[in-house]
A protein has these predicted regions:
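ATP-binding N-lobe of GHMP and related small-molecule kinases
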Residues: 1-99, 117-126, 161-165, 173, ...
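Glycine/serine-rich anion-binding loops at beta->alpha junctions
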Residues: 90-119, 137, 240-252
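Contiguous, small/hydrophobic- and glycine-enriched helical/loop subdomains that border
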Residues: 108, 112-149
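Nudix hydrolase/Nudix homology domain
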Residues: 345, 383-386, 390-447
Length: 447
């Protein structure tokens, strides 16, 4: 193996109590760390040099010299302990900086994990956590980022079971920057009446509001009242629980159901903020599938993950749509399954899928095999256009083909499919039967 790509995820804090100031100047705390799907993209590649690490950054701008970056420090520490050759590291930053979401710590931990795999060091999670602890207080959490109760300075971790599967989370990050010094300036260490672990494991999220606190909020909200406003706005939008994450400045809201697009759009426009919406828990779609980013002409400009493309950021990414007709003019449509986050239980274009990073539009056959199990066909490209829904922006490459053989829809990806006559389609348009995207394409190209 010469190259590896990983996806360092962010975390949020569910409750945070500062319990003691230590003689070494650090503070003991207790909190619950919970991973969330927003993630950076980390690529580590051997470069043939005897030693050393180069770092290239994309996405959110990282200030400072490369040699001071915690990723480089992680490489240096691993090289001090083990025999490593030179590597080139590229990090695409999606996790907001100065947000209280652990982006730098995640990058550090995943660098350790990536080097362990790339150089076949066979380190255990415990050994990697020991290395990570020396580089940052909460770095150890990201070696195996599952919900955990954290004590000490954040390095002592105990797994916890949190009832958040199928909840939705909204993350709001303004350009407000909170320094560690100002965050701790107003803190009076104390032992809470009830610790965070007991609260999140014994009560449903809707009952956390009046018992699960972040000690930093009192100080930070006075200095930055906009953050307090955002927290209140999340409750008004229907959140069952809202809080600032860590020492800020990201504010997060948990929802029983997907929040309205109108409420998240207003937060985005009113505060000029990054607003990202995710569903928590294991999903059938691969949240970390790599997708290309493109401009309005379809030219590749970068890359992102599926979760980032679908969380409301409106990052423009390419897809392919294939309309499959039979020789009688009937059109095959697929039924989207109920578990899909976008347009569940609606009929849609026969084949619709993402173009993976590094793939070309012409690799339509892969998506077609996956969805409806046909490969021996030739497709005609009709058009390409930008489609914007309430949740995402897609650069749609439209194809059509004629096919009379058996079609077998994927049981894993679809809820069936069948041919529809022209009259059937026209009589059902506008009645909630089809996806809006299919309706607009059919009317434009085939009506």
């Amino acid at each position: 193996m010469n190259k590896i790509t990983l996806f360092p995820c962010a975390k949020i804090n569910l409750g945070l109590n500062i319990t003691r100031k230590r003689s070494d100047g650090y503070h003991d705390l207790e909190t619950v760390f919970c991973p969330v799907p927003i993630a950076d993209i980390l690529t580590i590649e051997k470069n043939g040099k005897p030693a050393g690490c180069s770092l290239k950054t994309n996405g959110i701008v990282i200030d400072g010299r490369a040699e001071d970056n915690i990723i480089v420090k992680a490489y240096d520490e691993m090289a001090r302990r083990h025999t490593l050759t030179g590597v080139d590291i590229t990090i695409t930053k999606n996790i907001p900086i100065q947000a209280g979401m652990g982006g730098g710590s995640a990058d550090c931990a995943f660098t350790i994990k990536g080097l362990n795999q790339l150089f076949s060091l066979n380190l255990t999670d415990g050994e990697m956590r020991d290395i990570a602890k020396g580089l940052g207080a909460d770095c150890a959490f990201f070696i195996n980022p599952t919900p955990a109760y954290a004590t000490g300075i954040g390095e002592k971790l105990t797994p916890v079971d949190i009832p958040l599967d199928n909840h939705w989370i909204v993350i709001v990050k303004t350009d407000t920057a909170v320094s560690t010094r100002e965050a701790f300036a107003g803190i009076c260490p104390h032992e809470p009446e009830r610790n965070c672990r007991d609260i999140v494991t014994s009560l449903p999220p809707r009952e956390w509001k009046d018992v699960l606190y972040n000690d930093f909020e009192e100080t930070i909200f006075k200095l930055h009242p906009t953050l307090a406003e955002i927290k209140q706005r999340l409750y008004e939008a229907g959140a069952c629980y809202a809080c600032m994450s860590g020492s800020g400045s990201a504010v997060v809201g948990l929802f029983d159901d997907r929040p309205s697009v109108e409420s998240t759009d207003r937060l985005r426009s009113d505060y000029n903020a990054l607003v990202a919406t995710f569903k928590l828990g294991r999903q059938k779609d691969n949240a970390f599938e790599l997708l290309p980013l493109v401009d309005a002409e379809g030219r590749v400009t970068g890359k992102t993950t599926r979760s980032m493309a679908h969380c409301g950021t409106k990052l423009l990414h390419p897809v392919v749509h294939l309309h499959v007709f039979d020789t009688h003019g009937n059109l095959y449509l697929q039924k989207r399954p109920a578990w899909k986050d976008i347009q569940p239980d609606r009929w849609d274009t026969a084949v619709g899928g993402h173009i993976g990073y590094g793939e070309s539009v012409e690799e339509l056959q892969r998506e077609t095999r996956e969805e409806i199990s046909i490969a021996d066909f030739s497709a005609e490209k009709i058009d390409a256009y930008v489609f914007e829904s309430r949740y995402e922006r897609e650069y749609v490459n439209v194809f059509k083909t004629v096919y009379d053989k058996e079609i077998r829809p994927s049981e894993n990806e679809l809820d069936g499919g069948r041919f529809w006559s022209r009259d059937e389609i026209l009589s059902s348009i506008g009645k909630g039967v089809f996806t809006p995207n299919f309706e607009s394409e059919y009317v434009k190209y085939f009506k």
